[in-house]
């Protein structure tokens, strides 16, 4: 399970390595590396087709800030969570998972694989609270990862441009409005542009959390995240649609 060769754009994002994991043994090795390293915080994100309880989970990304793993859930399925140990790892309250709006991801994980992060910090909550405080008013809507990373990298033009190029290359393959199809996440081997895109999605989450937790302290954020994820998972409807843009914290 050797790190893939990084593109220059990803190197500028300061990722230590991007590892594609498509075997149960690879998942087990990944989790041993995380645990043996004493990692207390792990960035997480998911990719798939219509990602929610009614869709398909294809990719799960984890990053400890030094290495990013892109786990092939489409190929491994339940084995990644059972024999691989992902379910038990996610249920460990000693590990803080750091993500951006975990509602749709949790909806997919709970209904498709009976898995859920026991401890979750939502960078979207922190970013929105930061914005509200800086502008002196409460915005009625949440904003996405793109705006949050743009704000985070406002003084680092090189990294911002590298991220923009990486995201554009990936979106061109899977975003329908750009001529792509979400089904490409099921293509194997996974196109390099999608591997880079997936790795980039978690590249900055830990740094963003550390910078913005002054606006949204960990325990306070975890409670807000728990409430909004519970609401999404317990809803009779999948966690998707225009209502997801309304601020719910």
Listing of model-derived features with the role each one plays in the protein:
Residues 41-54, 105:
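Short acidic, Gly/Ser-rich segments with clustered Asp/Glu that frequently serve as metal-coordination loops
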Residues 68-97:
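Nucleic-acid-processing active sites and adjacent nucleic-acid-binding tracks
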Residues 103-114, 128:
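Short active-site loop/helix that positions an aromatic residue
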Residues 159-235:
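Acidic, Mg2+-coordinating catalytic module of metal-dependent nucleases/exonucleases
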